[in-house]
Amino acid sequence: MAPLELYAAPLLLLFCQFANEWCVGGWLPLFLVQRLGISPATSLLMLAEFWSALLIGRVLAQLIMPRVKHSRILLSSVAASFLGCIILIATNSRFGAAAGILLVGAGFAPVYPLVVEKIGARFPYYHPGFFNGIFSFAVTGGLLSPFLLGYVAEHYDIRVVMGWPLIGSGMVFVLLICIWIESKLSAPPVGRVP
């Protein structure tokens, strides 16, 4: 397998995941102010709620990953982020926004640790500089997506700010499934020594 084929899916997955997180992190306060009429100070507190949910979720994900099947973590993560984005798109209240923000933050949280674990297992003998390239590309997704979202939001409604991560979460889910299928198909049969 060519090197690009080996790491294309994890690379795209991290690109999309960083784009999702940074879109919400960058646009959430403006979304709350324009969509719900929440004060700028309160919207910044709600942004802190998002980052707190993401941080606490990542710590909890590290604790439960050895004990819970990764597919269950993934399905729960995707369901939470989908539901959170849908709630944020549809809500008219501060309570709905807070619930959606918690679900989005908690839903995004386990994806990064799951992918990093997969990348480490897939490329155990690679130089650390290789991983630097992967994560630099991922950060590029986090930088480009909020920038592009500004142009999209200008031409459409501010609700697109939460629709974008909804679509991105679907892409992350599909890419994670592809990575797991590929790892199952390329694994040596049980009982045989490679």
Language model features with spans:
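Intracellular juxtamembrane helix-capping segments at the cytosolic ends
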Residues: 109-123
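Helix-to-loop junctions at the C-terminal end of transmembrane segments
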Residues: 57-69, 153-154
